[in-house]
């Protein structure tokens, strides 16, 4: 039985942004500094997109959404629909309108997939929303555990994160491809989340091997950045010279 979310889809006239835009809440550097409590109500999502990824306050789960349905992926391996009252310190949304579709019908590693997609794109200086549906030979994910105050920096929080391995699984990977110049505001390169076909489990994607998948890409020309109106954000250190290394530590594959 399908579990119901309290998030409601809005009509086109009620939406607050154009389809060529990414609406992002806060910055990756603030998350690195331990700003885990945001003021963005996830009930607002339908104004800004039907597709996206992010996290929840206290880092209590990974956020994934597509086709107007959004889920919380917790560190215990469960997936539940987003509810009214849920908040996020960092998330990105867009209205997904396909510009390119590509079929993968043979085994392909993450590295080979990224090379192939990169060669198809009109420019690496634009933003793209990426969706992959189908059968995956494997998907490796993580979900950071819920944090309690006083918060530690994210490089410390990820040290105890559980790792999940899915084999021969059907599901959907969604996320964004961000140009290098925007690293720190967002996560440069491919930043992806996964949920299985049954909407039971998933997480932040570390690695994957495609088996029989359809890739859909939506090109984005604009970013609307909303900054948190909170004391934690006002007082955060966003001038960390090691932020690029810290992003690789927190978002990249485990060693």
From Swiss-Prot:
Q: Name one GO molecular function term.
A: acetolactate decarboxylase activity
What function is annotated for this protein? Converts acetolactate into acetoin, which can be excreted by the cells. This may be a mechanism for controlling the internal pH of cells in the stationary stage.
In its UniProt entry, what is this protein called? Answer: Alpha-acetolactate decarboxylase
Q: Identify its protein family.
A: Belongs to the alpha-acetolactate decarboxylase family.
The record's annotation in InterPro entries points to: Acetolactate_a_deCO2ase
Q: What induces it?
A: Strongly induced under anaerobic conditions. Activated by ResDE, Fnr and ArfM.
Query: Organism, per UniProt?
Result: Bacillus subtilis (strain 168)
Keywords associated with the record: Acetoin biosynthesis, Decarboxylase, Lyase
**Catalyzed chemical reaction(s):** (2S)-2-acetolactate + H(+) = (R)-acetoin + CO2
Instruction: Please tell me whether the keyword Lyase is annotated for this protein.
Output: yes
| The keyword Transport appears for this protein | no
Its pathway? Answer: Polyol metabolism; (R,R)-butane-2,3-diol biosynthesis; (R,R)-butane-2,3-diol from pyruvate: step 2/3
- The EC number(s) attached to this protein equal 4.1.1.5
Could you tell me the gene encoding this protein? alsD
Q: Which CDD domains match?
A: acetolactate_decarboxylase
Q: Which Gene3D superfamilies match?
A: Hypothetical protein, similar to alpha- acetolactate decarboxylase, domain 2 (3.30.1330.80)
User: What's a GO biological-process term for it?
Assistant: acetoin biosynthetic process
Note the Pfam families from the entry.
AAL_decarboxy
